[in-house]
Design a protein with these regions (language model features):
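Conserved beta-strand in the GNAT
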Residues: 59, 65-73, 81-86
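Conserved GNAT-fold acetyl-CoA-binding loop/helix
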Residues: 20-46
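Conserved catalytic-core motifs of GNAT/GCN5-like acyltransferases
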Residues: 115-119, 134-150
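A conserved beta-turn-beta hairpin within the catalytic core of GNAT-like acetyltransferases
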Residues: 74-83, 92, 111, 142-144
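A short beta-loop-alpha structural element at the N-terminal edge
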Residues: 2-17
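Conserved GNAT acetyl-CoA-binding A-motif
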Residues: 101, 108-121
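Conserved acetyl-CoA-binding loop-helix of GNAT-fold acetyltransferases
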Residues: 87, 93-106
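A short helix-loop-beta-strand connector motif used in the catalytic cores of GNAT acetyltransferases and
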Residues: 43-59, 81
């Protein structure tokens, strides 16, 4: 079982490499090239550090090596978004995504939210659907922005 901790300054270089590598080696097979290029350019070490400063970023490690990450940000009253949730390609399919999402969804901001949402790549839709996320635009339908949005609403 992997360990999960909060981001510490200095993680940004490794996280940037992880995010970019997974985009190129996994997501590029399923997503439009323009989307991959935009995300690749977005996930510089500097922007990863800024994302961590603005949100609650979690880092998953195995044997001291970083193998995954995800961030929770507040996007509105009683609403949060999970962003930049990625695993290294060799870590996919081993249950680590489930472990990571258990921690992300237990984050205090998610606990307080009525709605948790995220944007998904095509290859991750099954994973999110199994976790109870639905697409508000319709089953596997891209929104007007071209993105696949998934959400989970809590009944209170």
């Amino acid at each position: 079982m992997a360990e999960i901790r909060r981001y510490i300054p200095g993680d940004e270089d490794t996280l940037s490499v992880l995010l970019r590598r997974t985009l190129l080696e996994v997501n590029a097979h399923y997503c439009p090239q323009g989307e991959i290029e935009w995300l690749y350019n977005r996930y510089t070490p500097e922007s990863v550090a800024q994302i961590a400063a603005d949100g609650h970023t979690y880092v998953m490690t195995e044997g001291g090596a970083i193998v995954g990450t995800g961030t929770v940000i507040v996007t509105g009253e009683l609403e949060c978004e999970i962003i930049a949730a990625f695993l290294l390609p060799e870590a996919i399919g081993r249950g680590l995504g489930t472990q990571l999402f258990e921690v992300l969804e237990a984050d205090e901001w998610c606990e307080d939210a009525n709605r948790i949402w995220l944007t998904s790549s095509v290859n991750a839709l099954d994973f999110y659907e199994k976790r109870g996320y639905v697409n508000p635009c319709g089953y596997r339908t891209r929104g007007a922005d071209g993105l696949l949005t998934m959400e989970k609403r809590k009944k209170r």
